Amino acid sequence: MAAEGWIWRWGWGRRCLGRPGLLGPGPGPTTPLFLLLLLGSVTADITDGNSEHLKREHSLIKPYQGVGSSSMPLWDFQGSTMLTSQYVRLTPDERSKEGSIWNHQPCFLKDWEMHVHFKVHGTGKKNLHGDGIALWYTRDRLVPGPVFGSKDNFHGLAIFLDTYPNDETTERVFPYISVMVNNGSLSYDHSKDGRWTELAGCTADFRNRDHDTFLAVRYSRGRLTVMTDLEDKNEWKNCIDITGVRLPTGYYFGASAGTGDLSDNHDIISMKLFQLMVEHTPDEESIDWTKIEPSVNFLKSPKDNVDDPTGNFRSGPLTGWRVFLLLLCALLGIVVCAVVGAVVFQKRQERNKRFY
């Protein structure tokens, strides 16, 4: 894992232990804690290395139990999934494989943070590999389907780690991470790489890395944040940050992967869930969180992502038709100013002629 140290970015921290020659007590799990003071005066929601908030009933951690069998405590396998002593392989580097792993226990935490240690690798060259991994927090589990090995029209949250661009017209650079929230009414469109239903996303070069790769998902008080550590720097990098997300409690965590004509090894090394200690208002506490319908309060439609290669419609750069409209407005403004200037100039000329 990456070197030990505190990395503060967007209120996040991760302590990774165990490399020789570094300070620290040795290997240990990454876990969250809220610090009220940082350097004497900074207040923030920050995770640290204290394991008291790790929820083991929702976590997949080495050493795995049940190696060599078709099941393990707290987790169910499906499809091509294979358990080894070092990783859970969702699919091998073979065509037409689907596999998934799902937690037994529904999660009733209102605020949580999931750290995923994963690896996607294979022999395929550029754009000759696929398809990717999906991380799930959904109502239904162990239902195979066409969306990275799991069902379409799901209820809940999905984070897609997509390695292959099916849409040949896309401007985006793959691998690409995107987020989708669904109440069962939306279908994931593989031909467009899910762009029509994507809330936000980012390019993330996680395939065939020679070091560990991590992804973190935080959900707290309606804010969904996804961050990555892919550069072996022990540093979280912001990928997705969305507010107005509503997710119920009582759903299941899982991971799935699928291959088609192209393939890769899709491995999960660990999934660690942490409880975030967050105060809620009396009104929030009185809500039956199991009855909440998955939804997002949009500033704009996710379809606005179509011409935005970053996928982040809230803060992405101006591209495509947005640039065209901006230039058109500027041109019209110049024309109007020129016409008004010409009229004013002509009237001044006529007024000057009256004095001669």
From Swiss-Prot:
Task: Provide the disulphide bond pattern.
Answer: C202-C239
Task: Cite the binding residues for a carbohydrate.
Answer: S96, D131, Y164, P165, N166, H190, G260, D261, L262
Q: Which GO terms describe its molecular function?
A: carbohydrate binding; D-mannose binding; heat shock protein binding; metal ion binding
Entry binding sites for Ca(2+): D162, Y164, N166, D193
Cytoplasmic face residues:
346-356
Subcellular locations according to the entry: Endoplasmic reticulum-Golgi intermediate compartment membrane; Golgi apparatus membrane; Endoplasmic reticulum membrane
Membrane topology (UniProt): Single-pass type I membrane protein; Single-pass membrane protein
* Main localization (coarse): endoplasmic reticulum
* Source domain of life: Eukaryota
Q: Where does the entry say this protein is expressed, by tissue?
A: Ubiquitous.
Q: Which Pfam families does this chain map to?
A: Lectin_leg-like
List glycan-bearing residues: N183
Cofactor annotation remark: Binds 2 calcium ions per subunit.
Q: Which residues lie on this side of the membrane: Lumenal?
A: 45-322
- According to the entry, every stretch annotated as the L-type lectin-like domain falls at 52-276
- List UniProt keywords, sorted A-Z: Calcium, Disulfide bond, Endoplasmic reticulum, Glycoprotein, Golgi apparatus, Lectin, Membrane, Metal-binding, Protein transport, Signal, Transmembrane, Transmembrane helix, Transport
Q: Mind listing the GO biological process terms from this record?
A: endoplasmic reticulum to Golgi vesicle-mediated transport; positive regulation of phagocytosis; protein transport; retrograde vesicle-mediated transport, Golgi to endoplasmic reticulum
Query: Residues of the signal sequence?
Result: 1-44
Name the GO cellular-component terms.
cell surface; COPII-coated ER to Golgi transport vesicle; endoplasmic reticulum membrane; endoplasmic reticulum-Golgi intermediate compartment; endoplasmic reticulum-Golgi intermediate compartment membrane; extracellular exosome; extracellular space; Golgi apparatus
Per the entry, which co-factors are needed?
A: Ca(2+)
Spell out where the chain crosses the membrane.
Answer: 323-345
Q: Which purpose does this protein serve, as stated in its record?
A: Plays a role as an intracellular lectin in the early secretory pathway. Interacts with N-acetyl-D-galactosamine and high-mannose type glycans and may also bind to O-linked glycans. Involved in the transport and sorting of glycoproteins carrying high mannose-type glycans.
Q: What is this protein called?
A: Vesicular integral-membrane protein VIP36
Taxonomic source organism:
Homo sapiens (Human)
